[in-house]
Every structure is written in structure tokens, then in C-alpha cells.
Amino acid sequence: MNFLLTNDDGIDAPGIEALYEALGKRGVWVAPKNQHSGCGHKVTTDQAIAVEQRGKNRYAVDGTPADCTRLGVVHFYPEVDWVIAGINAGGNMGIDSYLSGTVAAVREAAILGHKAIAISHWINKPRTINWAWASHWANAVFNTLWQQDLPPQHFWNVNLPHWQSGDPEPEVIFCEPSRDPLPVAFTIEGSNFFYRGEYSQRPRQPGSDIDVCFSGNIAITQLRV
């Protein structure tokens, strides 16, 4: 299979290297030059998009994750079978999919007629991510998803739990995305407002992707454009 790799954390982020390892060091990288977390489905249409080659099959794009998908499937790797975005440092569950550049990259792929997977790693602060573990479980997830039916205009959204040594091995669970809002809270300093919503305090509807992931399992949802 031919893989196109992208993300929203940037081409130098450890997550895309972990993704590459999970795919057996296969695939073409077309990823943002800079960090674009939370950019949503923004695309560049009114100015040039600069691209810098970073060695064989690696391209750093001065644009958004959705720009990277467009350039990748149209110009750099039109023979791609799967577009895969991640591994994102932070969860992309429930309504996060509207905000996430990672999810936007694969939504764009689905719009353009390609199979796609977004994969993210929830961060249970103050823990840090074990990228070797993330790569191991990403590989297991992919081997499951290759066998699943994926209708046109649909894509997979995967969220890894924050596992640490001593925790039970996670199960792979297909589930529904949460529809609950993110916590919205701000602190005020003068005329400045600072977002202070606590991600880990999100509502946990039983069986939702948030509940599955926060419970220590791998949450997989099938989303549509």
C-alpha cells in the first residue's frame, strides 16, 4: 500500500516520526513546516504555498494540513492508497474534529476520494507521551482498519489513551463520537481573555469516544464529510 503522511504539529514533530515507524517506515511525508494545531479546515487559495524538500520523499509545506493533503494527493503522490495524519500530540475526540487540523487533513482526503485515517494521542497531564508505545499501538490499529469497510466520503478517527507502564493493555473499541461541548472557561487579565477549559473535565457519555479513551482504551470512530 502507498501512504501519504501529514499532521498539524509540523514536520519536525515526534508524532509523525512515530507514525512513519508504525507504517514500517513507508510513505511520503507532506506536512506543515510550522505548527498548525487547532487550525481546522483552513486552506490557502489567495497566495503562493512554498514547499521545501527535506530529503527523499519528505516535503515541508508553508501551509495548513488540508493544504498538505491537497498538494500530496494532486502533485507529490497521486498514486496514494491511504492518507494518514498524526500521531497528534493531544486528543481529537468528539467535536474536536471541527477544530483539528489533523482531522481536517483526512477529511480533505475523503472529499478528494481517498481513504484516510486521523490518529491522535490523548495527553493525561502531567504524563508525557511514550512515542514508542504510540507507534506500537498505531501499527496494531492500522492492521485492524485495513480489514474494515470504509464507505466513500467517510474516514477513520482514532484516539489512543495515555497508557503508562502497569496499566492494562488497551482494547480497540469502535464507538460513536461525543456530541458534548468542550469545557469553556476563561481568566481575565485587563482586557485580555485566556482560555482555561480543562480537557480532562469533558463530559463522558457512556460508550462515546471520550469515555472509551479516558477509560484507557483505543477509540475509533467513523466520520463522514
From Swiss-Prot:
Reactions listed under catalytic activity: a ribonucleoside 5'-phosphate + H2O = a ribonucleoside + phosphate
Chief localization: cytoplasm
Cofactors, names only: a divalent metal cation
InterPro entries: SurE (IPR030048), SurE-like_Pase/nucleotidase (IPR002828), SurE-like_sf (IPR036523)
Cofactor note: Binds 1 divalent metal cation per subunit.
Signal sequence annotation: none
Binding site for a divalent metal cation: 8-9, 37, 88
Keywords, in A-Z order: Cytoplasm, Hydrolase, Metal-binding, Nucleotide-binding
Compartment annotation: Cytoplasm
GO CC terms of this entry: cytoplasm
Alphabetized GO MF terms: 5'-nucleotidase activity; metal ion binding; nucleotide binding
E.C. numbers: 3.1.3.5
Function: Nucleotidase that shows phosphatase activity on nucleoside 5'-monophosphates.
NCBIfam families: PRK00346.2-3 (NF001493), surE (TIGR00087)
Similarity-based family: Belongs to the SurE nucleotidase family.
Protein name as catalogued: Putative 5'-nucleotidase alr3139
Organism: Synechocystis sp. (strain ATCC 27184 / PCC 6803 / Kazusa)
